[in-house]
Amino acid sequence: MGKTSQRKGADGERELSGLLQQHGFDIQRGGSLSFGTVPDLVGLPGIHIEVKRVERLNVGEAMAQAIRDAEKFHDGAPTLFHRRNRQPWLVTMRLEDWLELYNEK
């Protein structure tokens, strides 16, 4: 992964972390140079947060990474938070996980 890509990823993590903190969530960054040793962000109970801040995203590959990491860290439903330049943040998760979360409410 190139330095520009790493920087953009770290910027995306900081941006999303700040937005979630503004909404009252106690979000902490795992560190952009952790290379999978810790989650991108932590602080949403029952949700594994995978952050992607790219122009061209392969959602299938990104979700596969989120699923692998959620199983590795045992921290919740694999959830992909992603955004392109000048676009709003989007959240992608498996329907079965969303239904489980929604039915708990």
Predicted features and spans:
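Catalytic phosphate/metal-binding cores of nucleic-acid and nucleotide-processing enzymes, i.e., regions
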Residues: 1-105
